């Protein structure tokens, strides 16, 4: 057996085929948020090509599938500027199907009233209006894209969204495909050294009896089992950590919806050696159990 260059190839050696990237076509009504959607996907780690002529879809898909290129997720923003563009886009999608490339189509839409208002606010004509009114251009575009909208995998009506809300919606639709989930830092600290400025959430655990006053525990830290058991067995400590963990869950969900990548939760005690350390370790353990990417940091441990 020979390779593409005519050289003999060992038939026992399997040549890995190039892995085709996931392909998403972003199209829809002008002014409905195609570019905003593309930018949101870029933030999620997609490789985005904006305003690509439809006839370039097939060559681009082939290029990114070549060995050595690492573009696992490709999004292409395509608009329809006339009957020719629409025919080229439908033809390109059909050609991709014959090559066993099955792109998803995301169609952006909005009401006529909203689209008119958006074009008027930026003082730009609709690409299909010509010498007519904006609403006439919108009507022409709707007639051209009706079939494409019907075959779309996802249709998003952006009428009630601003730019940030649309970006958040796109992120929620594709959040399982993100390169990074929300990453949480759980920190312990001592109040006598100051409250950490970068913590979104600060919990004061000085209500727990201080192991410092227990001779056997004083030289140990909250990372040691005897201290951790002492702290977690204290009256109110178990209830506190249960409720605190539960209160953070909807907060973290909200952060993910807002595309926030990092969060810091801090526990403080007097010196940052016993109680705060034990509680930080416990919350970190629970978050890991729930699949949350987390690191535990003890800011002031060892300062005494």
UniProtKB/Swiss-Prot annotation:
Full protein name: Nucleotide-binding protein Krad_2934
The keyword Nucleotide-binding is annotated on this UniProt entry = yes
What exactly does this protein do? Displays ATPase and GTPase activities.
Sorted alphabetically, the keyword list is: ATP-binding, GTP-binding, Nucleotide-binding
Similarity-based family:
Belongs to the RapZ-like family.
Record: residues binding GTP: 79-82
| Residues at which ATP binds | 28-35
List the GO molecular function terms.
ATP binding; GTP binding
């Amino acid at each position: 057996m020979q390779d593409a260059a005519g050289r003999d190839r060992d038939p026992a050696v399997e040549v890995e085929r190039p892995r085709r990237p996931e392909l998403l076509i972003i199209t829809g009504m002008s002014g409905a948020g195609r570019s905003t959607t593309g930018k949101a996907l870029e933030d999620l780690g997609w490789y985005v090509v904006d305003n690509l002529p439809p006839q370039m879809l097939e060559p681009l898909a082939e290029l990114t599938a070549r060995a050595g290129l690492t573009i696992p997720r490709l999004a292409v923003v395509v608009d329809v500027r006339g009957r020719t563009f629409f025919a080229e886009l439908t033809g390109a999608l059909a050609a991709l199907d014959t090559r066993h490339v099955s792109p998803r189509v995301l169609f952006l839409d909005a009401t006529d009233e909203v689209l008119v208002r958006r074009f008027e606010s930026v003082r730009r004509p609709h690409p299909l209006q010509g010498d007519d009114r904006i609403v006439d251009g919108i009507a022409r575009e709707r007639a051209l894209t009706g079939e494409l909208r019907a075959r779309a995998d996802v249709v998003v009506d952006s009428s009630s969204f601003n730019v940030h809300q649309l970006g958040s919606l796109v992120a929620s639709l594709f959040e399982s495909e993100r390169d990074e989930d929300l990453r949480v830092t759980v920190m312990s600290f001592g109040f006598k050294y100051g409250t950490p400025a970068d913590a979104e959430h600060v919990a004061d655990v000085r209500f727990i009896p201080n192991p410092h006053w227990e001779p056997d525990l004083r030289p140990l830290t909250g990372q040691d089992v005897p201290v951790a058991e002492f702290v977690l067995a204290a009256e109110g400590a178990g209830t506190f950590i249960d409720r605190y963990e539960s209160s953070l869950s909807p907060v973290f969900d909200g952060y993910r919806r807002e595309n926030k990548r990092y969060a810091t939760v801090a526990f403080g005690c007097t010196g940052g050696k016993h109680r705060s350390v034990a509680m930080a370790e416990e919350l970190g353990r629970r978050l890991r159990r729930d699949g949350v990417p987390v690191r535990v940091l003890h800011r002031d441990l060892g300062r005494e």
